[in-house]
């Protein structure tokens, strides 16, 4: 009885071993962004597996918020690869003959969104097998920059830093001195694997060229730093120069303002003078015409008077023209009425006329 039971169990083990199986073990694959990931899935068939061959790849996204999605399928001797939009056109079977036992795929141009668990399922009735692969996409360190944070002067404290523009954690750093003795200062040894080295009481011996290499599991990058520790600068001279420069700038600004204001005053004065000139006022007559009209009026008045009646008049200064003639419109001089004697009036043809007079009491005389 015991021998029969052992024979049955042995036959079951042999039959299980001969069924469909995937020979590639489960694993985790790490690749850099932009590279191609090879996901292996090799299988063997047993003589009992007589059904149609179906191969299916699925993805379980890393955020665990989405259900498993089919990314590529082989069924009925046809390939279907347009199930998952994020991987459309980037996932392919590596073998042209999947019946040979190779269901491996390539995922090209890897992105961070491709991180997740991929599952390979092979079916050939009555055999069924599956295997999982964990894919991790990392970003290579790139754009590393080395620089000094602080003043590179003797006796001062500053920091030298190494910073990559991008790169997946964890990151490792390594500092080296490339010039002179190529030996790092003793006080820096504890920080040679850090992104920042703190420099205390700097000396000229620290001057030189340094390199920083930053790396992770998928790549590395490097930057160089030229450190030049110099004596302290003359800050008093710099301050004095800054003050003098400021004063000169203020003086220049003041001069510009003064010139602008002066020009405005001149323009304003010219406008006022221009507005004071009236076009509707005729210009004053010349001195010659004024003097001639004055002399002519005197001659006409005096021509009808006898010499005896001219005693009360002073001789007019014809050579002097009043200054007021230049300031106002010339006017004919007003002369007192001439007194003519009765004999002269008779000779001139005058006719005597009797004019009644009125006495003080109102009677006419």
Curated annotation (Swiss-Prot):
Transmembrane segments: 238-258
Posttranslational mods: N-glycosylated. Palmitoylated on Cys-259 and/or Cys-260; required for proper localization to the plasma membrane.
Any one biological process term the GO annotation gives: mitochondrion organization
SMART domains noted in UniProt: IG (SM00409), IGc2 (SM00408), IGv (SM00406)
Modified residues (Phosphoserine): 297, 304, 306, 323, 332, 363
Record motif PDZ-binding, residues: 360-365
Region annotated Disordered, chain positions: 269-343
GO molecular function annotation: beta-catenin binding; cell adhesion molecule binding; cell adhesive protein binding involved in AV node cell-bundle of His cell communication; connexin binding; identical protein binding; integrin binding; PDZ domain binding; signaling receptor binding
One of the record's GO cellular component terms: cell-cell junction
Key words of the record: Cell adhesion, Cell junction, Cell membrane, Disulfide bond, Glycoprotein, Host cell receptor for virus entry, Host-virus interaction, Immunoglobulin domain, Lipoprotein, Membrane, Palmitate, Phosphoprotein, Receptor, Repeat, Secreted, Signal, Tight junction, Transmembrane, Transmembrane helix
Tissue expression: Expressed in pancreas, brain, heart, small intestine, testis, prostate and at a lower level in liver and lung. Isoform 5 is ubiquitously expressed. Isoform 3 is expressed in heart, lung and pancreas. In skeletal muscle, isoform 1 is found at the neuromuscular junction and isoform 2 is found in blood vessels. In cardiac muscle, isoform 1 and isoform 2 are found at intercalated disks. In heart expressed in subendothelial layers of the vessel wall but not in the luminal endothelial surface. Expression is elevated in hearts with dilated cardiomyopathy.
Residues carrying a glycan: 106, 201
Residue positions bearing lipid (S-palmitoyl cysteine): 259-260
Ig-like C2-type domain location: 20-134, 141-228
Ranges in the topological domain labelled Extracellular: 20-237
SS bond list: 41-120, 162-212
Compositional bias segments (type: Basic and acidic residues): 269-282
Pfam family, one: Ig_3
Domain-level remarks: The Ig-like C2-type 1 domain mediates homodimerization and interaction with JAML. The PDZ-binding motif mediates interaction with MPDZ and MAGI1.
Summary of subunit composition and partner proteins: Monomer. May form homodimer. Interacts with LNX, MAGI1, DLG4, PRKCABP, TJP1 and CTNNB1. Interacts with MPDZ; recruits MPDZ to intercellular contact sites. Interacts with JAML (homodimeric form). Secreted isoform 3, isoform 4 and isoform 5 can interact with the extracellular domain of the receptor. (Microbial infection) Interacts with adenovirus subgroups A, C, D, E and F fiber proteins as well as coxsackievirus B1, B2, B3, B4, B5 and B6 capsid proteins.
Role of this protein: Component of the epithelial apical junction complex that may function as a homophilic cell adhesion molecule and is essential for tight junction integrity. Also involved in transepithelial migration of leukocytes through adhesive interactions with JAML a transmembrane protein of the plasma membrane of leukocytes. The interaction between both receptors also mediates the activation of gamma-delta T-cells, a subpopulation of T-cells residing in epithelia and involved in tissue homeostasis and repair.
Name this protein carries in UniProt: Coxsackievirus and adenovirus receptor
